[in-house]
Regions:
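Short glycine- and Lys/Arg-enriched binding-loop motifs that mark or flank ligand-binding interfaces
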Residues: 11-14, 26, 51
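Hydrophobic alpha-helix-in-membranes signature
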Residues: 21-23, 68
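A short, exposed loop/beta-hairpin motif centered on an aromatic-Gly-Thr core
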Residues: 24-33
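Short aromatic-glycine-(Arg/Gly/Cys) micro-motifs in beta-strand/loop hairpins
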Residues: 8-21
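Short, charged, surface-exposed hinge/linker loops at domain edges
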Residues: 1-5, 38-79
């Protein structure tokens, strides 16, 4: 059965960090976005194998992702 996971990529000093939204333990880094994608896919495969071996429930993908806009300079101080 095919599951789709949502990946988040963040630019870091050494390249890119990739992490799955639905499975935050699946995280990796690469020198560029392509390497990071490849390594994230490999990390996901390894995590699926580890979870199966430990008889743990594999998190399902398919999260709903949306951006939440905010004008940071318009936010006042809290009480």
């Amino acid at each position: 059965m095919l599951h789709n996971y949502s990946a988040k990529y963040t630019k870091i000093a050494s390249g890119y960090m990739g992490q799955l939204i639905e499975w935050p333990e699946v995280v990796t880094e690469g020198k560029d976005i392509e390497e990071c994608r490849m390594m994230l896919r490999d990390a996901l495969n390894e995590m699926v194998l580890a979870y199966r071996e430990q008889r743990k429930e594999i998190p399902l993908g398919g999260a709903l992702i949306e951006q939440v806009p905010i004008e940071v300079q318009d936010v006042g101080q809290t009480a």
